[in-house]
Amino acid sequence: FGVPQLRKRLIFIATKDDSNMPEFIFPSPTHADRYNTVWDAIGDLPLIGAGESADRYKTKPISEFQRIMRSKRSKLYNHKAPNHPQETVEKIRSTVPGEPMYEKYRQRIRLAWDMPSPTQLAGGIRPQFQFGHPEVPRGLTVRERARIQSFPDDYIFTGGVVQGRVQTGNAVPPLLAMAIGSSIDKMLTEFYQKVKLVENM
């Protein structure tokens, strides 16, 4: 559904047996052949170093996904990079994008521009750092994580980097929620049209 992330989700939609509700039809995938990549998601955000921040865009949107995420905003929120020891910076710098940064923790990779992100987690080995940025040797900002989850830039996360990581990692991606919500709306519309038809007979 356009979320630039490889993540499996288990979604339950339930109705009462005696409600005469139409069968729920799960929405068909929209981006199976042309998925959004990390570049599509965050390629327009300012390239900042570890411990740095930025509150203004420096370029125009490059992809349709970025255009949707910005929605004509000029101010940028939650784009503060976690600070790392120099040893960590060098570890990220020496890692090829798409490859794990640590042999022991192979789920901690440096993201690649041309692929979707793996699953964004709320927890992890360290509170500030799960994936490395594809180009800059640091972990992701809350805004970059939010983009990868398909949160628009006008959604502002409160708290620090750790709280932002928990909020983004635990969330259902808005684009997924919108697709499922649209299917629920169709099901309910069909149901109430039938109810109204029966009442008018």
Where in the sequence are the language-model features?
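C-terminal target-recognition/interaction regions appended to catalytic cores
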Residues: 59-201
